[in-house]
Every structure is written in C-alpha cells, then in structure tokens.
Amino acid sequence: MSPMRRLLIALATATTAAALLAGCSSKDTGGPLPEAAPLVKESATTTANLKSAHLALSVTGQIKNLPVKTLEGDLTNQPTTAAKGSATITMLGSDVDAKFIVIDGDLYAAITGDDYDNFGSAANIYDVAAILSPDKGLANLLANLTDAKAEGRDTINGQKAVRVTGNVPADAVNALAPQLKATASTPATVWISEDGDHQLAQAQLSPSSTNSIQMTLSNWNAPVTVEKPAGA
C-alpha cells in the first residue's frame, strides 16, 4: 500500500480538527527602499547557511496532491535534515490535526494520540525538512528569483522586513514543492530582514490568483533536536 493511501486511510478514521496560525504581519513605512537584487542575493547566501528555524506554513485555496493546510514546527539540517511539529491536513473533506516527525528521510505521524506510524519516504507526501536544503529549499528559491522589485516594508513577527516581488522558475518551484507541478515561472513574494545578515522572514508562492503557499521563518539557528519516535 502506498504511503499516501496509508495516510488517507489513517486520516479518514480521525475526527479531530484544528487550525494553526501563520506568521503575523503589519505594514511599515519610512525611508527609501534598498535595491532588491543585492538584498535577495545576500539573503540567499544567509538562507543557504541556515542550520535551523521555526516554520509556520499555510496554504490558501486548494492545491492538488498537497494535503497540508497549515503546519508549524522546527526544522534543522544538523547533524542531518529533520523536522518535527504539527499540521492540519485536509483529506476527504475533513481537517485533521496530526503531529509529525521527519528524520532519515521518513515521515512519522501521529494522527490521534501520541502513537506514531511510519509512512515511509517523506518525499512521497510532503518533505517539510527540505525547506532548509540549500539545493532544493528556500535558499534555492531566492537564488533563482527573477524580476526582483522592492515593493515596501512590513513587520513580520516583530521583525522589520523589505517586501520583494518577483518570479521563480518552474524547476526551483518544483524542487521546493513538487506537488505544485509547475510548468512555468510562478509569482513569488519574499520578506527579507533589512538589518543584519538579511534573514528570510517570509516567502509566498502564488501558483494562481486563488492558491498560495506561505512560509514564515523565525528562531533562526536556534538549537533544534529531532529524535525518532519511541519504538520506531
């Protein structure tokens, strides 16, 4: 039985529902905006060197083959790529809250209670840990962002950031989120911290006018420990 089918069956028997909040933002003004291209380039380098972060992810609309509605958790790539947290997953018309662990490439999920099942390769469902991958994740998105334009300033989770719009080639989009199956460039907006080493505060991909994926990062490089579930 495929990992996705196993997850479908497990979710179909669950009755809990939840809603997680993504990063809060507000408008900010004042002073001329920095040039977008150098800012994005510096942020791409910083993001490629990121060792860990807290992630709040939300999906607006419906994206085929992407069951995640909201997700919140901690990611790390030290000593290996891993993640842990909770997600609201939409299946068969119902929203179900599940805790998850991604480690050694496998996805473990607890649909109800604290008993985790191994659903096999995370890449077959959604590999959230890949977001920190320098080659496939947000760093790669930034490195390939074209037509970058600084549009304004916002405050993301208390962090002042420059809002930059642009387009991301299909290859970079599909590396980050294969479920999108992009065939052309996708509009994107990124929010980059104006101070310091220009950490990426938030990114949004908009494959259509009604569908988008938003990823908000915080707690950059804070220690994160991920372990296999007991008995796994």
Model regions and ranges:
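Subset-of-secretome marker
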Residues: 3-9, 25-232
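C-terminal motif of bacterial Sec signal peptides marking the signal peptidase cleavage site
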Residues: 20-23
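Hydrophobic alpha-helical membrane segments, chiefly transmembrane helices and signal peptide h-regions
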Residues: 16-18, 55
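Sec-dependent N-terminal signal peptides
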Residues: 10-15
